[in-house]
Amino acid sequence: MEDVKLQFPSLPLCKEEAEDWAYPMRREMQEILPGLFLGPYSAAMKSKLSVFQKCGITHVICIRQNIEANFIKPNFQQLFRYLVLDIADNPVENIIRFFPMSKEFIDGCLQTGGKVLIHGNAGISRSAALVIAYIMETFGIKYRDAFTYVQERRFCINPNAGFVHQLQEYEAIYLAKLTIKMMSPLQLGRPLCIQSGATGSLKRTLDDEDELGNMQVSAAHEG
């Protein structure tokens, strides 16, 4: 059996003097990671341009349903780079399919020194789920740990039950995907054991590449 151990960076530590949460803060955006902000649409309205500029925002992920398009709009497309996603805040919505493109967009922003805001309508469920998934995959941690990390910075987050289930399933998916990337063609023909680094604990034995692929497809259609 081949052991493939994945290494992940450490999560940035909490600020020593974290600001006490107050109810009006739910209408503002909070910085979750250096350069990554989470908030509601009220933080991305036209009247907030000066706040965007003060915070150094360069990229925005705007999450909405088609029926919300009349009031949730990418207001600064001439000034910032946008990724607009059509996601319903519904437990049966397949949100996993949006995780890879969101991660690519966020990574592209942060790696070039930019700053990104992820927002939906309230900044509580859909956008929070994308941020949690990003932290899970980037730092190799479980859903509960990623949720706690985000909630310490934006207390009001509350992904719906279907999103929570998919986030819990996503750990196996991203670990399998990263492991396949690291493996040689010879290793792909052998049984393998996937281990996350010190920050994760998932250990999954798989027979071959086909089983990995099937696992990803089936998990992505749950919830």
Curated annotation (Swiss-Prot):
Matching entries from Gene3D superfamilies are given as: Protein tyrosine phosphatase superfamily
GO cellular component terms attached to this protein's record? cytoplasm; nucleoplasm
UniProt cross-references to Pfam families, sorted A to Z: DSPc (PF00782)
> Which InterPro entries does its entry note?
Dual-sp_phosphatase_cat-dom, Prot-tyrosine_phosphatase-like, STYX-Interacting_Phosphatase, Tyr_Pase_dom, TYR_PHOSPHATASE_DUAL_dom
Instruction: Give the record's GO biological process terms.
Output: negative regulation of SCF-dependent proteasomal ubiquitin-dependent catabolic process; regulation of ERK1 and ERK2 cascade
**Where would I find the Tyrosine-protein phosphatase domain in this sequence?**
28-176
What would be an example GO MF term here? F-box domain binding
Report the sequence similarity comment from the record.
Belongs to the protein-tyrosine phosphatase family. Non-receptor class subfamily.
Function, as annotated, reads:
Catalytically inactive phosphatase.
PANTHER family (alphabetical): SERINE/THREONINE/TYROSINE-INTERACTING PROTEIN (PTHR46588), SERINE_THREONINE_TYROSINE-INTERACTING PROTEIN (PTHR46588:SF1)
Recorded protein name is: Serine/threonine/tyrosine-interacting protein A
Query: Origin organism of this chain?
Result: Xenopus laevis (African clawed frog)
Identify the gene encoding this protein: styx-a
